[in-house]
């Protein structure tokens, strides 16, 4: 009787708990496309933070509002664009990292150039 009860409890645990856990572990969220329009002004970007998940495609349209401005993602040489007033620049990339990665202005746009940066914050796929 005790052995039968133990089997029943084990099977019930598998059906209710472990099966759900296995399903959750095997679940992969579908990558999204995130469209972001960034306005670059002397000394700052709007917005300054892009939130994404690892595996998402981010499409950035950079608009220079006063003078030329750049957008380069630290450690990713292929993510590097420059926009001029009235001439937006665009780039798309797949987020292939976890955590935060900085972007910064690559064009010496004036005295506040050094403060021109932002952050792409990526969370792991499991945290969706």
Identify the residue ranges that each predicted region occupies.
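N-terminal Sec-pathway targeting helices
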Residues: 1-12
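Extracellular/periplasmic metallocenter environments
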Residues: 3, 15-31, 84-128
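N-terminal edge beta-strand
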Residues: 29-57
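Soluble periplasmic/extracytoplasmic beta-strand elements of cell-envelope proteins
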Residues: 35-39, 59-61, 72, 104, ...
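Non-catalytic surface loops within mature trypsin-like serine protease
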Residues: 40-42, 64, 75, 95-97, ...
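Short solvent-exposed loop/turn micro-motifs enriched in small/polar/acidic residues
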Residues: 42-43, 74, 86, 113
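Glycine-centered loop/turn positions within well-structured domains
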Residues: 43, 69, 99
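Extracytoplasmic/periplasmic/luminal assembly and interaction segments
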Residues: 50-92
């Amino acid at each position: 009787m005790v052995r039968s009860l133990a089997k029943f409890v084990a099977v019930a645990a598998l059906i209710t708990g472990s099966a759900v856990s296995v399903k959750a572990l095997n679940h992969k969220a579908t990558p999204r496309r995130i469209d972001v329009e960034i306005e670059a002004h002397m000394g700052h970007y709007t917005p300054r933070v892009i939130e994404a998940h690892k595996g998402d495609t981010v499409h950035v349209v950079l608009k220079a509002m006063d003078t030329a401005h750049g957008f380069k993602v630290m450690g990713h040489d292929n993510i590097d664009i420059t926009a001029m007033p009235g001439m937006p620049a665009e780039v798309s990339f797949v987020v292939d990292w976890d955590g935060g990665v900085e972007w910064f202005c690559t064009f010496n746009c004036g005295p506040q150039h050094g403060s021109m940066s932002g952050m792409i914050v990526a969370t792991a796929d499991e945290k969706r």
